[in-house]
Amino acid sequence: YIYVYGYKTPCSSKMLSKYVSPYDATVVSSLKKAGTIFTGKTNLDEFAMGSSTENSAYGPTKNPWNPDFVPGGSSGGSAAVVSAGSAVASLGSDTGGSIRQPASFCGVVGFKPTYGTVSRYGLIAFASSLDQIGPITNTVDDTRIIFNEIQGYDSKDATSITPEFTKLDNKKIKIGILKELMQEGVSNESQNEVNKVVNLLKEKGHDVTEMSLPLTEMALSVYYLIAPAECSANLSRFDGVRYGIREEASTSYEMMNKTRSVGFGE
């Protein structure tokens, strides 16, 4: 969930139901300077933990194409609002697919930038070594416009970098296509679209080469080790003392226990 000054920022959780953003996230400041008008916040899975936008204290988000289907998640509200035509663009956060998957489900464009190219200052963290803010729009061109405004080094984010692509100046580059990502489970339609892009890049003079990362098959298992561990550390701050709601109790331990029991989940 991304801070916008003066907006409630509940993270789709009872825990932060009354919490109001005290400042703008860096990406929000950048877009405001560019003239962007923010119209509201969207729904997501609680604290970005989910892939369907059904796990929210405020109810599920429906897919604009068919309300019987989910919009994906965790940034399902961000994808749905663009798909429905209620906004030209939105922002989401992507840890393990939370921008790209709902964008796919809703028929729009979602982009997870390279880690560090977009400041995470003002993002409520899920898994800090994986989280990245990115745009959701209707077209690749719109995605490029939003990304160009939010990318760049930010001293407020210790993981921020100066993106190397700013130095390319349309030079011919070498691009790798991962063999492991084009195997069983990928639809013919998806493979055909990737092949179209590969051919386009070759026509532009770029060196497009098939490459292999044999450990790719272990990626999901590793993700489920890293993400829950970092999530546990990040959610520990919501204890009824510093942030969020507070349940009354006779001891601090009991207070934290009651607060977290009421604040998290259903």
Task: Label every model-predicted segment.
Residues 1-95, 195-199, 203-205:
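Gly/Ser-rich catalytic/binding loops embedded in alpha/beta enzyme cores
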Residues 112-192, 250-258:
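A short helix-breaking turn/cap at a secondary-structure junction
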Residues 55, 59, 221-234:
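Charged, often glycine-rich, active-site loop that binds/positions anionic groups
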Residues 186-213, 244-250:
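Acyltransferase
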Residues 95-121:
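Glycine/threonine-rich beta-strand-loop-alpha-helix active-site module
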Residues 2, 44-45, 95-99, 103-105, ...:
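Acidic, glycine-rich active-site loops and adjacent beta-strand->loop/helix elements
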Residues 7-9, 49-53, 100-105, 122-123, ...:
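Short acidic, glycine/serine/threonine-rich loops at helix termini
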Residues 1-13, 170-178, 229-266:
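Short helix-loop capping/hinge segments that flank enzyme active sites or metal/cofactor-binding pockets
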